[in-house]
């Protein structure tokens, strides 16, 4: 077994290079292929290459960093065992590494973690302790146990040897193609981006390294803007593999020094990238696994890049099968192949026919309507696009010129998640109500807690929930409230669920409000 030497507190680039070269990751990990995406290359007029980390034994890159750190532990540390907290790929990487090294591993996972993930960790040989409502509570428990029982804490990203282990991916990349122009790397806590960037800049500094973050969990961008790591007030949960509130201290130091640029993308763009990967190389990526490709596509469009060799990292494929339904629904929006519109048309015979004729033969993908007013009808309509955003703007202008009142809901998250399934649900009389969107943990008792905290004191006038196959569900709820209800805000804070006031959302006003 090769030696994995400890690094200094803040290693320089050359020290990281030596650590990458010495990291014994191939005792557990595999060299993954770099594959050309033929269809996308033709479509985008660039050579698009994908680094297939979904081919690792644990179906993600996380095995590299976990094994690199654990292989360097002393015999005494190995005898005491290791501990970590994770609800995803890092947990599987630690469990797999522990089995290879013959080291006991305790993985603390939130109680809401899906059974498929718990079973995977146990299948790789890890012992699982379910504790806490979220990752932060699980992590606190893991650190407490490490101090009490002498376990070595294996962090998911913010440790020099973990970073060096992830850097072995970049070494493979350069050996597989030394003529790359840019490499796009997904960012959660920053371990992969830091490892890839520091390695590439030591060997081939002319290659640009671009970080890609999800818009709703962009902790690196927030840190770069502030000049130091900061806590995000909330993180989105769709791309849960990169749902990190705060970038690591060491990963931030390296990213700040070695990255060339950063770009953020929304959930629809990620869904579209997942579809691209499936259609081109038949890979079923998890959302965070397709993040780098989503960023690459956006970056190409923004900077009009042509004729370059561009690589991106498919970082993982531990996708929940039931979540693919949501991806299928959203990828058309991410590719600008569908527009969602709220249109007011006359409540009279032939008005829908006239409206469709005005669309000029374009395919209607969705149409939601229910009688509510004798004079006007508000319809929720989806229209297929062939020329993206430009065509969407043309349709909006054409409808306005035709005398229709129209609101573009294509970028309205609440409309896409909830309202499209609820059109026609106006109350029979006006209500004084406020609307909120919530993120619920998918765990037993979550709904009961919600009702006990809020439903006992205020009437719930609207409620919509739909599972998307993740650890968290999305809920839309309205409450009958007066103008001044300070107790309601107090109860909201007690509930502890992430929520947003949606009362003034145009989709709500058009289709659901009293």
Curated annotation (Swiss-Prot):
Q: Which GO terms describe its biological process?
A: branched-chain amino acid biosynthetic process; isoleucine biosynthetic process; threonine metabolic process
User: Positions modified as N6-(pyridoxal phosphate)lysine?
Assistant: 62
Per the UniProt record, one Pfam family is: Thr_dehydrat_C
Q: Which InterPro entries match?
A: ACT-like_dom_sf (IPR045865), Ser/Thr_Dehydratase (IPR050147), Ser/Thr_deHydtase_PyrdxlP-BS (IPR000634), TD_ACT-like (IPR001721), TD_ACT-like_sf (IPR038110), Thr_deHydtase_biosynth (IPR005787), TrpB-like_PALP (IPR001926), TrpB-like_PALP_sf (IPR036052)
In this chain the ACT-like domain maps to 339-411, 434-504
Q: In which pathway does it act?
A: Amino-acid biosynthesis; L-isoleucine biosynthesis; 2-oxobutanoate from L-threonine: step 1/1
Keywords of the record? Allosteric enzyme, Amino-acid biosynthesis, Branched-chain amino acid biosynthesis, Isoleucine biosynthesis, Lyase, Pyridoxal phosphate, Repeat
Question: Domain of life of the organism in this record?
Answer: Bacteria
Could you say how this protein's activity is regulated?
Isoleucine allosterically inhibits whereas valine allosterically activates this enzyme.
Q: What induces it?
A: Constitutively expressed.
Q: What is its EC number?
A: 4.3.1.19
Q: Where does pyridoxal 5'-phosphate bind?
A: 89, 188-192, 315
GO MF annotation, one: threonine deaminase activity
Q: What does the UniProt function comment say about this protein?
A: Catalyzes the anaerobic formation of alpha-ketobutyrate and ammonia from threonine in a two-step reaction. The first step involved a dehydration of threonine and a production of enamine intermediates (aminocrotonate), which tautomerizes to its imine form (iminobutyrate). Both intermediates are unstable and short-lived. The second step is the nonenzymatic hydrolysis of the enamine/imine intermediates to form 2-ketobutyrate and free ammonia. In the low water environment of the cell, the second step is accelerated by RidA.
Q: Which PANTHER family match?
A: THREONINE DEHYDRATASE, MITOCHONDRIAL, THREONINE DEHYDRATASE, MITOCHONDRIAL-RELATED
Do you know which NCBIfam families this protein is assigned to? ilvA_2Cterm, PRK09224.1
Quaternary structure annotation from Swiss-Prot or TrEMBL: Homotetramer.
Q: Return the protein name.
A: L-threonine dehydratase biosynthetic IlvA
Q: Which organism is it from?
A: Escherichia coli (strain K12)
Name of the encoding gene: ilvA
